């Protein structure tokens, strides 16, 4: 069994995809992962990513957002 903690959910303004971010703690060993769930209509894309991947992905997205005009 694993523990699932919701972190954030939102809908993308252009495209309407529903995005959910969840922390997943696996019962065996207690490994923590970040689950990214993207729903487009009836289709789901799910990524379970480790800490290093989440850090790199987050930093890249934040850097891109800072470069965009407001």
Where are these regions (language model features)?
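Positively charged, low-complexity terminal tracts
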Residues: 1-70
């Amino acid at each position: 069994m694993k523990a699932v903690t919701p972190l954030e959910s939102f809908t993308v303004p252009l495209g309407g995809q529903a995005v959910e971010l969840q922390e997943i703690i696996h019962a065996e060993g207690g490994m923590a992962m970040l689950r990214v769930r993207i729903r487009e209509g009836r289709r789901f894309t799910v990524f379970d990513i480790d800490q290093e991947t989440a850090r790199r992905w987050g930093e890249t997205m934040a850097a891109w957002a800072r470069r965009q005009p407001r």
